[in-house]
Swiss-Prot record:
Residues that hold (2R)-2-phosphoglycerate according to the record: Q167, K359, R388, S389, K410
GO cellular component terms, semicolon-separated: cell surface; extracellular region; phosphopyruvate hydratase complex
PROSITE patterns reported in the protein's UniProt record: ENOLASE
Pfam families xrefs: Enolase_C, Enolase_N
Enzyme Commission identifier(s): 4.2.1.11
Species in which this protein is naturally found: Mesomycoplasma hyorhinis (strain HUB-1) (Mycoplasma hyorhinis)
GO molecular function: magnesium ion binding; phosphopyruvate hydratase activity
Protein name, as recorded: Enolase
Pathway participation: Carbohydrate degradation; glycolysis; pyruvate from D-glyceraldehyde 3-phosphate: step 4/5
Subcellular location(s) per record: Cytoplasm; Secreted; Cell surface
Purpose of the protein: Catalyzes the reversible conversion of 2-phosphoglycerate (2-PG) into phosphoenolpyruvate (PEP). It is essential for the degradation of carbohydrates via glycolysis.
Cofactor note (record): Binds a second Mg(2+) ion via substrate during catalysis.
Length: 450
């Protein structure tokens, strides 16, 4: 039995310069694993709690209350004591021991960031001890599918200080034959988009996830730029066929929702400030009008997927949205389901979505994440493994995407090392598994008819 000999946590910084937690685990046989926990900007209300130092003894003089020293202390003084001497290969048992120590529904006692850091580092230490890569340890011999990347080339919402209310405008290289080719396609489109934005007088500053963050007058203008960039790069803006590149949107609509009304707040502010080029236009929508708005976008642009098109509390709206468009489009739940198997079960029963976004830190352990993915796949749902806006050099999600044959991954644009690190890891995995590697492209959408 390979026993854990040491667990050590420390405070480090994420891609926004905010504190996060890094955990290292060592075993008696020489295994070692290290993990850095990500952090989100637009978060679901039912996510597991990310423990920060606000309200603790650290608040007044440590990162303005955003520090994670409390979570670090919980790892070093509580979790480490509990888990030392236990077999590193028993992931589920160790995860359950931490959950029993915490004793809360949302992991607020120890902090989901503390628990997840340990859970991830344990998995990596186990893989290291067995001398196998993480994707093979988590997925076994069946781990072979490289994910179609959703590349967030235009940022908005909480991820950028611009005028776009929708959070992410993404491209999906569906016509590529391999993951490496998909990145080559994306690279060409990304740099073509930069030239088009410059030519139109826009800056090419980037948002939290590495995509451009121009001050555009509407979501349609952002989509027009994407279509033009795809075409000028030599590809087809389409959801299927040769050289097809489709578009995906993350509306992050919970950020826009209040008292039953969706408001494009950034656009509204730009109009009220009478900024140049911003003409009066509609900025408020009911649920039914939002669904109709997406219908207009679907009819006009090659959009294949929408994430959080409605607010997390608008369950009836999600059901209507999926009834209307779920047979032809991927309707992804993120804030709605927060990688929680219990909530996903409710969504499956109500037929509220047909796809789920998977974020490790929304639920807080490797075991619970795998349970949610398994439930989604059994229900015939697609799964999208996702980063957070606050990231690091940690590449765990790349291995996870291959381990569970998720088929899709969201990990930002083709800039910022914290995003590129995941793509580079996937390139290495594709090379390592060579002839058994699969990239499904448009076939990844097995549960819809385009």
């Amino acid at each position: 039995m390979s026993k854990i000999s040491k667990i050590k946590a420390r405070e480090v910084l994420d891609s926004r310069g905010n504190p996060t937690i890094q955990v290292e685990v060592w075993t008696e046989a020489g295994g070692h694993g290290s993990a850095i926990v990500p952090s989100g900007a637009s978060t679901g209300t039912r996510e597991a709690l990310e423990l920060r130092d606000g309200g603790t003894v650290y608040e007044s003089n440590w990162f303005g209350g955003k520090g994670v020293q409390t979570a670090v202390d919980n790892v070093n003084n509580k979790i480490a004591v509990l888990l030392k001497g236990h077999c590193v290969l028993n992931q589920r048992k160790l995860d359950n021991m931490m959950l029993q120590l915490d004793k809360t529904e949302n992991k607020s006692a120890l902090g989901a960031n503390a628990i997840l850091g340990v859970s991830l580092a344990i998995a990596k230490a186990a893989a290291d001890e067995l001398k196998i890569p993480l994707y093979r340890y988590l997925g076994g011999t069946n781990a072979h599918q490289l994910p179609v990347p959703m590349l967030n080339v235009i940022n908005g919402g909480e991820h950028a200080s611009n005028t776009l209310d929708f959070q992410e405008f993404m491209i999906m290289p569906l016509g590529a034959k391999t993951f490496k080719q998909a990145l080559q396609v994306a690279n060409k489109i990304f740099h073509t988009l930069a030239k088009l934005l410059k030519k139109a007088g826009h800056g090419t500053q980037v948002g939290d996830e590495g995509g451009f963050a121009p001050n555009l007058k509407s979501h349609e203008e952002a989509l027009d730029f994407l279509v033009k960039a795809i075409e000028e790069a030599g590809f087809r803006p389409a959801t299927e066929g040769e050289n097809a590149v489709a578009i995906a949107i993350d509306a992050a609509a919970s950020e826009l929702y209040h008292d039953g009304i969706y408001t494009f707040k950034k656009l509204k502010k730009a109009i009220e400030e009478k900024r140049q080029g911003f003409e009066p236009t509609r900025v408020q929508f009911t649920t039914e009008e939002m669904i109709q708005y997406f219908g207009h976008l679907f009819h006009t642009y090659p959009i294949i997927s929408v994430e959080d098109g409605l607010a997390e509390s608008d369950w009836k709206g999600f059901v209507r949205f999926t009834q209307k468009f779920g047979k032809t489009h991927q309707i992804v739940g993120d804030d709605l389901t927060v990688t929680n198997a219990k909530i996903l079960a409710e969504a499956i029963e109500k037929k509220a979505i047909n796809s789920i976004l998977i974020k490790l830190n929304q639920i807080g352990t490797v075991s619970e994440t795998l349970d949610t993915i398994e439930l989604a796949h059994k229900a015939g749902y697609t799964t999208v493994i996702s980063h957070r806006s606050g990231e690091s050099e940690d590449t765990t999600i790349a291995d996870l995407a291959v381990a569970v044959n998720a088929g899709q991954i969201k990990t930002g644009s083709l800039s910022r090392t914290d995003r590129i690190a995941k793509y580079n890891r996937l390139l290495a995995i594709e090379e390592a598994i060579q002839s058994t590697a699969q990239y499904k492209g448009e076939k990844v959408f097995f549960n819809i008819k385009k």
